[in-house]
Amino acid sequence: MSDLSLLQCTNLSKRYQDGKLSTDVLRDVSFEMSSGEMMAIVGSSGSGKSTLLHVLGGLDTPTSGEVIFKGQPLSTLSAAAKADLRNRELGFIYQFHHLLPDFTALENVAMPLLIGKVPTSQAQDKAREMLAAVGLEARSHHRSSELSGGERQRVAIARALVNSPSLVLADEPTGNLDQRTADTIFELLGELNVRQGTAFLVVTHDLQLAGRLNRQLEMRDGQLQQELTLMGARQ
């Protein structure tokens, strides 16, 4: 693993067992990602993309293989240590924003900091800063139910970045948005990558979206291809 390596997974496999029936969702996946890199993994639904993100984020355990983050094998960490790592080092963005509906945009964005025991005033100041970065400073006291779909996703991005994570794992982050809003969101991710040096690993079935990132790999039937064949991708 190089000095600039942020994330490495080696011979990663994931098998789900249901009685006598077994399903191999990930099969011998290996790749390395550098600090500050923006990388896309393209694949159709059911190809194993989301499972891979869950394993990389320590939300699921591989059947075999290893995930190494900043030189630390995840297999050596307790559940509490993984949770702490996720809160300090990782950000998550999903197709559906998963905002708390009864909380304001400011409260949603501040939540990871409060979980990390950051003082409330400091957490709110940082949350305001991130909402300003995504162009929503004026909407900070609106509940998520009062925001448009694009605004909610921008709040989710601000929440993912409020802890200044080294890596953001994004699962179809624009899949629920119209093309114009999706374009705006991806311009924002690029700006934050440059401004904060945040690395982004984005899984998507949208080839046009993936083409905006530094590197593209393809997931097909649980295996990672080092070159795109475009099978199952949407152009």
From Swiss-Prot:
SUPFAM superfamilies per UniProt: P-loop containing nucleoside triphosphate hydrolases
Protein name: Lipoprotein-releasing system ATP-binding protein LolD
Record keywords: ATP-binding, Cell inner membrane, Cell membrane, Membrane, Nucleotide-binding, Translocase, Transport
Major location (coarse): membrane
Pfam families: ABC_tran
Membrane topology type: Peripheral membrane protein
GO biological process, one term: lipoprotein localization to outer membrane
Keyword Transport: yes
InterPro entries documented for this protein: AAA+_ATPase, ABC_transporter-like_ATP-bd, ABC_transporter-like_CS, ABC_transpr_LolD-like, LolD_lipo_ATP-bd, MacB-like_ATP-bd, P-loop_NTPase
GO cellular component: plasma membrane
Residue ranges annotated for the ABC transporter domain, each copy included: 7-234
Keyword Translocase listed: yes
PROSITE patterns registered for this protein in UniProt: ABC_TRANSPORTER_1 (PS00211), ABC_TRANSPORTER_2 (PS50893), LOLD (PS51244)
Subunit text: The complex is composed of two ATP-binding proteins (LolD) and two transmembrane proteins (LolC and LolE).
EC number: 7.6.2.-
Positions with a binding annotation for ATP: G43, S44, S45, G46, S47, G48, K49, S50
Family of this protein: Belongs to the ABC transporter superfamily. Lipoprotein translocase (TC 3.A.1.125) family.
Subcellular location: Cell inner membrane
Any one GO molecular-function label of the UniProt entry: transmembrane transporter activity
Role this protein plays: Part of the ABC transporter complex LolCDE involved in the translocation of mature outer membrane-directed lipoproteins, from the inner membrane to the periplasmic chaperone, LolA. Responsible for the formation of the LolA-lipoprotein complex in an ATP-dependent manner.
EC class (word): translocase
